[in-house]
């Protein structure tokens, strides 16, 4: 042990004393535990004790190991023998007597009584008694409680120096553990020895004459005035009773700093103290808590938000984890704020923890809101609370003024801005906000509906969807084809049509057909649902309809007129505009064209087609959609080759797809019907007028028939009707072989162009839909991030 030589007697004596001081059997004795009592019992001045602690190395380490403890005892013996206090003296001084520790007569009697009561440290009612030096054969390792804390004379203890805010009549039975904070090597209030009955050791500073008689009071026992007042004994029972009421001694109070020692102290308090419920709040404590509550929240019926509570309780300097646990216990309703009752419970727990009490796993019943018993002032009261006000501040600075107007002043202004605390202080409310942010957004406009197809699978804000809906309605007032309104069957039907028409990715991007992007103007068409979604309806507004089929001014928001303009020459648009000017009155023609056309985008069209055969009025308004091919023939003859070449270059892959679909028997039948119908149509207008020639239908009708390939199966009856009508028309109309060949070529060319145009538009629509989808997803993610960044904004 660093060259320390001990005799057998010293070895045994020091070993017994070390075991006596090492309550937790950790081989590390805290500096201000029983060791402090031992040194005080040696009746050495404060400066000598501090010097001994420095020399042995305990001050540097913060605890006494066995070697430091033995050296300290050796130095105590050196000091008591009057030799110079140096480390060298422990080996140079010969025949050094064992260190002497003075115990009063009362203490010895108490020790004797304790031996009869219990050998357990936890039950030592006379824990304030420290056994005499083991060398004299009186050493008891852990007899009763080892603490030297003795009750003070009631006269002294009734000093009127109570804290400004702290009640003066704190529970008389609160153990001295509440005043553990004052026991520092500094010696506390050594200048105020309380002479009274009971075995007290002389203070560090001066060995008093009465100390030999047992009247010397351990100065540390009377720490800062706040503790004296806080634990005022104005109405306490006699000193004899006090002996049994103060089980926790210096040892408990100091070792309480560790978790294990805290558990021991609590056990001692539970078993040896006379108070009933340590968690009950007395009237005095309640009043103090209420006053503190008012400093934060003047309205007693109000509540203190988590942020304010955090700022207040952080001043207690308790670890963040403990404060978090206290918050979880006290925030009974988990609303992120503290009511008055919850605040009192939290304050009580903080005070208790500051005084060495373990925090309970669950909130004690006496602290639960609406169950707090505040009328037990006559009861022995709850220790945690009393000393918490004055004692807790004294822990760090023992010299703090006794007056404690508020915890804000007494507790060091140390706001531990820890995220851990922040999470605990506002966890309950923030967690709800984060998990339910969607519901917070939704109420923005409950009347609006999510209209855009993409958001159907997502959850965009309704405000954004409302804007989109307004745009849609501006273009399609009567359009019942919004994604939300389309029936699943319609969607599947449209998907079929799209696949048959070879719209690769355009129509099914969002899980619904691209019919949305091909709406002809339902406003003008009225109830003609069949032509509502004509295949080439992508032409947005009447400004620039697709060349072959001039659109009637649908003003569709999703159409891409600019692209169409680029694709087709301006002359085409001009001709079509002219064609639109005079709608050809060809009732029979719309019937065949409508049959396939509606099928392209609406399953309802199948039914509508059948009825449309008889409802020519509906078809009439649609006529403007059909180009007047009597005029178009000339243009087709000249520009067919050019447009075909250009379209083939732009979309070479479309043509094979279209051709691939032609071989199907159903498509061929449809085309044959359309061609025959077109021929007859051309003949019919010849009789009437060249402008009304039904040549215009070919492009769209043919496309419709192609699209309706899937629907042709369910519309077999309709098909037969159309064939019958065509046959009748053919028989009634004289054939014009001269124009038939020309018409065929023109019609086929226009069909190809329309197909290509439709494919281009479908692909463009698909791309635009995908872009919109991506933008919406990005918007949603940004909204989510925004919500996550402001969960605590309400506090």
Swiss-Prot record:
Membrane-spanning intervals of the chain: none
Basic and acidic residues compositional bias, start-end: 707-720
Compartment(s): Membrane, Clathrin-coated pit
Residue span of region Disordered: 112-238, 380-433, 469-720
Record PROSITE patterns: EF_HAND_1 (PS00018), EF_HAND_2 (PS50222), EH (PS50031)
Phosphotyrosine modified-residue sites: 288
Protein's name in the database: RalBP1-associated Eps domain-containing protein 1
């Amino acid at each position: 042990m660093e060259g320390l030589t001990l005799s057998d007697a010293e070895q045994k004596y020091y070993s017994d004393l070390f075991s006596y001081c090492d309550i937790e059997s950790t081989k590390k004795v805290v500096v201000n535990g029983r060791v402090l009592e031992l040194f005080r019992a040696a009746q050495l001045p404060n400066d000598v004790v501090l010097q001994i602690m420095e020399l042995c190395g305990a001050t540097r380490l913060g605890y006494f190991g066995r070697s430091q403890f033995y050296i300290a005892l050796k130095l105590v013996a050196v000091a008591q023998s009057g030799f110079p206090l140096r480390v060298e003296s422990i080996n140079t001084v010969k025949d050094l007597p064992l260190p002497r520790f003075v115990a009063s007569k009362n203490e010895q009697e108490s020790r004797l009584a304790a031996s009869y009561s219990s050998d357990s440290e936890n039950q030592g009612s006379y824990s304030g008694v420290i056994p005499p030096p083991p060398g004299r054969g009186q050493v008891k390792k852990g007899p009763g409680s080892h603490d030297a804390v003795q009750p003070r004379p009631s006269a002294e203890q009734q000093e009127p120096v109570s804290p400004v805010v702290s009640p003066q009549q704190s529970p008389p039975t609160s153990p001295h553990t509440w005043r553990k904070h004052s026991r520092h090597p500094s010696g506390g209030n050594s200048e105020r020895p309380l002479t009274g009955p009971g075995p007290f050791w002389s203070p560090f500073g001066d060995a008093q004459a009465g100390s030999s008689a047992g009247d010397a009071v351990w100065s540390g026992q009377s720490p800062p005035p706040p503790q004296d007042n806080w634990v005022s004994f104005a109405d306490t029972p006699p000193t004899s009773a006090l002996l049994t009421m103060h089980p926790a001694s210096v040892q408990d109070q100091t070792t309480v700093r560790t978790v294990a020692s805290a558990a021991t102290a609590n056990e001692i308090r539970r078993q040896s103290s006379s108070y009933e419920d340590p968690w009950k709040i007395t009237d005095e404590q309640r009043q103090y808590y209420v006053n503190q509550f008012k400093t934060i929240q003047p309205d007693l019926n109000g509540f203190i938000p988590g942020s304010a509570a955090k700022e207040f309780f952080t001043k207690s300097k308790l670890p963040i984890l403990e404060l978090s646990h206290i918050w979880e216990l006290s925030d009974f309703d988990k609303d992120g704020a503290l009511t008055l009752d919850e605040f009192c419970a939290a304050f009580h727990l903080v005070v208790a923890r500051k005084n060495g009490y373990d925090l309970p796993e669950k909130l004690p019943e006496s602290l639960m809101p609406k169950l707090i018993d505040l009328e037990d002032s006559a009861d022995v009261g709850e220790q945690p609370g009393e000393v918490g006000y004055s004692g807790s501040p004294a822990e760090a600075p023992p010299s703090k003024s006794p007056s404690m107007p508020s915890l804000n002043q007494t507790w060091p202004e140390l706001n531990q801005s820890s995220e851990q605390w922040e999470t605990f202080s506002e966890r309950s409310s923030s967690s709800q906000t984060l998990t339910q942010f969607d519901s917070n957004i939704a109420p923005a406009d409950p009347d609006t509906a999510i209209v855009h197809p993409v958001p159907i699978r997502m959850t965009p804000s309704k405000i954004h969807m409302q804007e989109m809906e307004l745009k849609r309605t501006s273009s399609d007032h009567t359009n019942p084809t919004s994604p939300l309104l389309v029936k699943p069957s319609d969607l599947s039907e449209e998907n079929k049509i799209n696949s048959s028409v070879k719209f690769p990715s355009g129509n099914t991007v969002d899980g619904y057909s691209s019919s949305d992007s091909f709406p002809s103007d339902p406003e003008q068409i009225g109830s003609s649902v069949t032509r509502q979604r004509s295949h080439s309806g992508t032409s947005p507004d009447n400004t620039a309809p697709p060349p072959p089929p001039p659109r009637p001014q649908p003003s569709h928001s999703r159409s891409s007129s600019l692209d169409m303009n680029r694709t087709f020459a301006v002359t085409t648009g001009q001709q079509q505009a002219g064609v639109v000017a005079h709608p050809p009155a060809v009732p029979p023609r719309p019937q065949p064209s409508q049959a396939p056309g509606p099928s392209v985008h609406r399953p309802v069209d199948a039914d509508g087609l059948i009825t449309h055969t008889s409802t020519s009025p509906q078809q009439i308004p649609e006529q403007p959609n059909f180009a007047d091919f009597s005029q178009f023939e000339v243009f087709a003859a000249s520009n067919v080759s050019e447009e075909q070449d250009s379209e083939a270059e732009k979309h070479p892959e479309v043509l094979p797809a279209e051709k691939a679909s032609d071989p199907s028997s159903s498509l061929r039948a449809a085309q044959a019907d359309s061609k025959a119908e077109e021929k007859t149509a051309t003949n019919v207008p010849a009789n009437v007028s060249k402008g009304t020639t039904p040549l215009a239908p070919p492009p769209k009708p043919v496309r419709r028939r192609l699209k309706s390939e899937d629907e042709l199966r369910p519309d077999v009856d309709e098909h037969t009707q159309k064939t019958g009508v065509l046959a009748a028309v053919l028989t009634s109309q004289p054939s014009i072989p001269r124009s038939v060949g020309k018409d065929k070529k023109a019609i086929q060319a226009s069909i190809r162009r329309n197909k290509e145009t439709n494919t281009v538009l479908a692909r463009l629509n698909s791309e635009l839909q995908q872009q919109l989808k991506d933008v919406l997803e990005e918007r949603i993610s940004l909204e989510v991030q925004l919500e996550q960044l402001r969960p605590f904004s309400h506090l």
